[in-house]
Amino acid sequence: MATVEELQTRVKQLEEELERERTRNRGGTDGGGGRKKIDQMSSEVVDSNPYSRLMALKRMGIVDNYERIRDFTVAIVGVGGVGSVTAEMLTRCGIGKLLLFDYDKVELANMNRLFFQPHQAGLSKVQAAEITLRDINPDVEFETHNYNITTVDNFQHFMDRISHGHLKGDRPVDLVLSCVDNFEARMAINTACNEQGQVWIESGVSENAVSGHIQVIKPGETACFACAPPLVVASGIDEKTLKREGVCAASLPTTMGIVAGFLVQNTLKYLLEFGSVTYYLGYNAMQDFFPSMAMKPNPNCDDSFCTKLQTEYQEKLLAQPKEEAKEETVEEVVHDANDWGIELVAETTEEELKAASHGHVPELVEGVHVAYVRPMTQEDEEGAAGLTVDDQESLEDLMAKMKSI
């Protein structure tokens, strides 16, 4: 049972939260974080500008127009270990509006993760998140929903909010981020997004807390969550029957933070159109392994909306004008006597070969050839020019002349 001091502390916290809400409802410019709302982002480098380092991305040529981030609306489903950090990162980046969905409450068991604080125990996660996030950045607009999206009534309301809850009016949100920890909620998000053709990013951390992943899902273009479901989903097993009393999944704030970082990084690249969006990125902490791939949709997917969108996407591709095939310039093979196109060049020059061909070649028996002919020197040429041979003299006469010398 709570002590008097604990109750008094709790009352004080609630009074502070109530005062923040009153200030916000009165239209005050102070968002609760001690600074006034900023109407327009500035790149001015001063200590009082919370956006100066973000706007530096423009100066460095990374993003063309970072200010556009204030025009985007993102829905985050699940405000736990990954979702709360994701919401915080997007808030610090200056996102226009966040829709937060979660039915759970903050517990002391959540303190091993990031974001939540012990004094927030007992508050709903979406309420605690909104209070903290408003203090961080009062320029962001928040919309919170404290319910389970998998029930029939709540599912319909969830679909309505992601299709009409945009910052700019009655239109769909720009992106849905799944940060839930169960397959039932993932399938609900998958169904809603397939039905509305909504792009979303799924994320998850393993039960042993040392691996995780993110997956971008564009209905009809990439594989949805039902195209290649986990074994638990494919087998039709109720997840609730797998839980045991006194047993819980492991949780590391490091893995949660890494997966949340990947999720937000991909979100920024998708919204602000810079870099390459990774359609699937995994993380294995044991080997520091980061696999990435693109997953094609399953033509036999159980979700009828997915197969319908696949057909529409293929028809759209066929309707696009075909790109003319570019003629590839084939490099001329230097030397076709080998597989590498290597040109064989002799070390002896043409002049040296020509000079060598005039040298003296001795008479050898058949089958034996000289390997090298000594080029004729100038003295050899002069001697050869002054040498005359009389073919009329016999061998005996020549020998007689030699003896007389």
UniProtKB/Swiss-Prot annotation:
Chain span(s) of sequence motif UFC1-binding sequence (UFC): 390-405
Keyword Acetylation: no
Binding site for Zn(2+): C224, C227, C301, C306
GO biological process terms on file: protein ufmylation
Disulfide bonds: none
GO MF, any single term: metal ion binding
The entry's keywords: ATP-binding, Cytoplasm, Endoplasmic reticulum, Golgi apparatus, Membrane, Metal-binding, Nucleotide-binding, Nucleus, Ubl conjugation pathway, Zinc
Region Linker: start-end pairs: 346-377
One Pfam match: ThiF
GO cellular component: cytoplasm; cytosol; endoplasmic reticulum membrane; Golgi apparatus; nucleus
Record's compositionally biased regions (Basic and acidic residues): 7-24
Subcellular location: Cytoplasm; Nucleus; Endoplasmic reticulum membrane; Golgi apparatus
Binding sites annotated in the UniProt record for ATP: G81, D102, K125, N148, N182
Coiled-coil stretches: none
Region (Disordered): 1-44
Active-site feature positions: C248
Matching InterPro entries: D-isomer_DH_CS1, ThiF/MoeB/HesA, ThiF_NAD_FAD-bd, Ubiquitin-activating_enz
Family: Belongs to the ubiquitin-activating E1 family. UBA5 subfamily.
Record text about domains: The UFC1-binding sequence (UFC) motif mediates interaction with UFC1.
PANTHER family in UniProt: UBIQUITIN-ACTIVATING ENZYME E1, UBIQUITIN-LIKE MODIFIER-ACTIVATING ENZYME 5
Function noted in UniProt: E1-like enzyme which specifically catalyzes the first step in ufmylation. Activates UFM1 by first adenylating its C-terminal glycine residue with ATP, and thereafter linking this residue to the side chain of a cysteine residue in E1, yielding a UFM1-E1 thioester and free AMP. Activates UFM1 via a trans-binding mechanism, in which UFM1 interacts with distinct sites in both subunits of the UBA5 homodimer. Trans-binding also promotes stabilization of the UBA5 homodimer, and enhances ATP-binding. Transfer of UFM1 from UBA5 to the E2-like enzyme UFC1 also takes place using a trans mechanism.
Subunit structure of this chain's protein: Homodimer; homodimerization is required for UFM1 activation. Interacts (via UIS motif) with UFM1; binds UFM1 via a trans-binding mechanism in which UFM1 interacts with distinct sites in both subunits of the UBA5 homodimer. Interacts (via C-terminus) with UFC1.
Name listed for the protein in its UniProt record: Ubiquitin-like modifier-activating enzyme 5
Species of origin: Branchiostoma floridae (Florida lancelet)
Taxonomic lineage of the native organism: Eukaryota, Metazoa, Chordata, Cephalochordata, Leptocardii
